[in-house]
């Protein structure tokens, strides 16, 4: 027995010596803090069980466009989990991510979805019910800046798509509609969480154009006695995307764990965590379980209405694009 005990002790010691300590950096967009705090704990436990290795995931959050720029400029993110595919494409264009990144994971590397809704104050005093109510005189709108925020670009395109569908696809009328909406914007923060804080904490504005997950988080955390969610008649299907940063994981030798980290987002546990944090899950079984949590509405895609992100970025958000044109007061 003594001999067996010594051998077992040596086995434990050797296992402990072989276990690695790994660090990953996830550079993400603004309102995913709570999601990834929970997900990182779950993945670390999963990876420990699978491999014996200890993995610690650090998080960085900000406007999606600014976060992409930080990765382009050299911040050593192992993975990016950004608000939209264009921001990942921008990193890929600089050679830091494989240009075929979007095909590496299911659903075009978008493991969960969201949409754009309105958060209003209790009682809905300005009677906000749909996009057309946001252009009424005297309505103060809060939304982030599309130049820095991915969420803001989804907001803008959701409004534009609504205007197209209600004006026989007349682009000029859609531009007039979105221009009128932005004339009512009181504060343009750099990111979605900043806009939420402006509306919720600082008490500025009548309506916040928000990620659905951010609106649900605000009502659940701060109380339904203070805010209400208004789901418009139609909105855009927002598809946040994820990728490992090839140049970084090759340099740091973290490719295996970075790949596993992103793939686990599609697992039943990963999908459950996404749903609990008010993102719409891709997994059909998990989606069915949370069916009552997400209102039904007509959703259109960026490909259907805008011809994809590359075209939308060029037409609307590049220097001299329609956002710059409508921003001239």
Task: Give the ranges of each region predicted by the language model.
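Ligand-binding "clamshell"
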Residues: 91-106, 217-231
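Extracellular/periplasmic juxtamembrane helices and adjacent flexible linkers that interface
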Residues: 249-329
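A bilobed periplasmic-binding-protein/Venus flytrap-type ligand-binding module shared by bacterial periplasmic
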Residues: 116-124, 239-256, 273-277
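Alpha-to-beta junction loops
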Residues: 74-80, 138-139, 202-207
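N-terminal signal peptide c-region/cleavage motif recognized by signal peptidases
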Residues: 14-16
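A conserved helix-loop-strand patch within extracytoplasmic ligand-binding domains
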Residues: 92-165
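Ligand-binding pocket segment of bilobal, Venus flytrap-like solute-binding proteins
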Residues: 166-233
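Early extracytoplasmic/lumenal segment of secretory-pathway proteins
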Residues: 19-94, 104-105, 211
């Amino acid at each position: 027995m003594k001999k067996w005990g010594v051998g077992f002790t040596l086995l434990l010691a050797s296992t402990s010596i072989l276990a690695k300590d790994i660090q990953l950096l996830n550079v993400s967009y603004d309102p995913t803090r709570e999601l990834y705090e929970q997900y990182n704990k779950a993945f670390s436990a999963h990876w420990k069980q699978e491999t014996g290795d200890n993995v610690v995931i650090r998080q960085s959050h900000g406007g999606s466009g600014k976060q992409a720029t930080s990765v382009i400029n050299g911040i050593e993110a192992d993975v990016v989990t950004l608000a939209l595919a264009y921001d990942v494409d921008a990193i890929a264009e600089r050679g830091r991510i494989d240009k075929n990144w979007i095909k590496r994971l299911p659903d075009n590397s978008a493991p969960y979805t969201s949409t754009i809704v309105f958060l209003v104050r209790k009682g809905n005093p300005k009677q906000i019910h749909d996009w057309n109510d946001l252009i009424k005189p005297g309505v103060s709108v809060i939304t982030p800046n599309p130049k820095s925020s991915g969420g803001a670009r989804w907001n803008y395109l959701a409004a534009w798509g609504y205007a197209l569908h209600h004006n026989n696809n007349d682009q000029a009328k859609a531009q007039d509609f979105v221009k009128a909406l932005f004339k009512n914007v009181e504060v343009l923060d750099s990111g979605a969480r900043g806009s939420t804080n402006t509306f919720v904490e600082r008490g500025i504005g009548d309506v916040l154009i928000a990620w659905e997950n951010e609106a649900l988080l605000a009502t659940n955390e701060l109380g339904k006695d203070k805010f209400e969610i208004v789901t418009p008649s139609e909105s855009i299907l927002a598809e946040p995307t994820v990728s490992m940063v090839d140049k970084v994981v090759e340099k740091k030798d973290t490719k295996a764990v970075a790949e596993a980290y992103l793939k686990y987002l599609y697992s039943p546990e990963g999908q459950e965590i996404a749903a609990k944090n008010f993102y719409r899950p891709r997994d059909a079984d998990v989606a069915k379980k949370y069916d009552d949590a997400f209102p039904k509405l007509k959703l259109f895609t960026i490909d259907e209405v805008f011809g994809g992100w590359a075209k939308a970025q060029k037409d609307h958000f590049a220097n001299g694009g329609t956002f710059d044109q409508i921003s001239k007061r």
